[in-house]
From Swiss-Prot:
InterPro entries assigned to the protein according to its UniProt record, in alphabetical order: Split_barrel_FMN-bd (IPR012349), UPF0306 (IPR011194)
Family: Belongs to the UPF0306 family.
Name of the protein in question: UPF0306 protein ESA_03544
Organism lineage: Bacteria, Pseudomonadati, Pseudomonadota, Gammaproteobacteria, Enterobacterales
Annotated source species: Cronobacter sakazakii (strain ATCC BAA-894) (Enterobacter sakazakii)
Annotated NCBIfam families: PRK03467.1
Length: 144
């Protein structure tokens, strides 16, 4: 199993991402439920454009963040750190993605917030179940 396969398998089992954006003067982080797309190596999430992080991001922004489990046992720690690009997904592109998101999180059907994409460009996965401090790294730039 290559690094992206192992990372993707774990990410597909999680559901909350913490992501951070900045505007040159300040940084702000937010949490969201996400849908992971293995083919695009991207997260899809809902967030209001009028939120603090939505205003900072505009329609396109650099982003960094984490996805982590909640174990209390050091030997079982697993988590992802990432960097990439946050983009507001416009219609009609957002329609099929939004339907997939709604299937995973049915409560989202009543939410009017738009869909965003976090395109992952660098992923570092720490997986202590493979040995203490074991890291798997994936870089989009190396895939071209």
């Amino acid at each position: 199993m290559d690094a992206l396969d192992a990372i993707s398998k774990w990410l597909a089992k999680q559901h909350v991402v913490t992501y951070c954006v900045g505007n040159g003067e300040a940084l702000w982080c937010a949490n969201a439920f996400y849908l992971y797309d293995r083919e695009r190596v991207a997260f899809y999430l809902l967030s209001d454009t009028e939120s603090r992080h939505g205003k900072m991001a505009g329609k396109l922004a650099p982003v960094a963040g984490t996805v982590n489990g909640q174990t209390k046992t050091v030997a079982l720690i697993r988590g992802v750190q990432f960097s990439g690009e946050l983009r507001l997904v416009e219609e009609p592109e957002s329609e099929a993605l939004r339907e997939r998101y709604n299937r995973r999180f049915p409560v989202a059907r009543v939410m009017s917030s738009p869909l965003w994409e976090i395109r992952l460009d660098e992923i570092k996965f720490t997986d202590n179940t493979l040995g203490f401090g074991k890291k798997l790294v994936w870089l989009r730039a190396e895939q071209a």
